[in-house]
Amino acid sequence: MSLERAVRAKIASKRNPEMDKEAQEWIEAIIAEKFPAGQSYEDVLKDGQVLCKLINVLSPNAVPKVNSSGGQFKFMENINNFQKALKEYGVPDIDVFQTVDLYEKKDIANVTNTIFALGRATYKHADFKGPFLGPKPADECKRDFTEEQLKAGQTIVGLQAGSNKGATQAGQNLGAGRKILLGK
């Protein structure tokens, strides 16, 4: 198998149809429109118009001009504008897909992961009341301990690995018992 074919097979194996469906249903719920029947998930997203509608619902006027015609470069501009708006909305840069992942269908799983990252980012916007996608991100819960509390913690046997009962060697026998005979 050629290297290129192996890479394509690996990328295709990352794709989860259930996640694609969940992302599609979430997008449809947010923009209040169904995807056209008979078109695949990636084909609907390819021109970037649906993605721009999505971010404009979540963050009004995030993408002021959505290109509905004009060819490949205008559609790629839609995708780039969507990506820029994602970062401004709070999606980490590491979670944002590359334009070719969608437009050339190189890594649709990465596109779906970006949509899930956007779904997680909606939790951080108190004004968003719509349906959420993905798990709620954890909030930082910083603790401040006094020196006395830290010293007291050093004397306690940690129970992270289970119980500290039976932590002695009493009753442990391995192999035959040893007899020490003196004077023979």
UniProtKB/Swiss-Prot annotation:
The record's GO molecular-function terms, alphabetically, read: actin filament binding
- UniProt note on tissues of expression: Found in synchronous muscle; not found in asynchronous indirect flight muscle.
User: Would the keyword Ribonucleoprotein be found if you checked this record's keyword annotation?
Assistant: no
Q: Which PROSITE patterns does the entry link to?
A: CALPONIN_1, CALPONIN_2, CH
Q: Which GO terms describe its cellular component?
A: actin cytoskeleton; cytoplasm
Q: Where are the Calponin-like repeats?
A: 157-181
Annotated Calponin-homology (CH) domain ranges read 17-122
The record's listing under InterPro entries reads: Calponin-like, Calponin_repeat, CH_dom, CH_dom_sf, SM22_calponin
Query: Which GO terms are recorded in the biological process aspect for this UniProt protein?
Result: actin filament organization; myoblast fusion; regulation of myoblast fusion
For this protein, the record's SMART domains field holds: CH (SM00033)
Which keywords belong to this entry? Answer: Muscle protein
By sequence similarity, the record places it as follows: Belongs to the calponin family.
Q: What is this protein called?
A: Muscle-specific protein 20
Give the gene name. Mp20
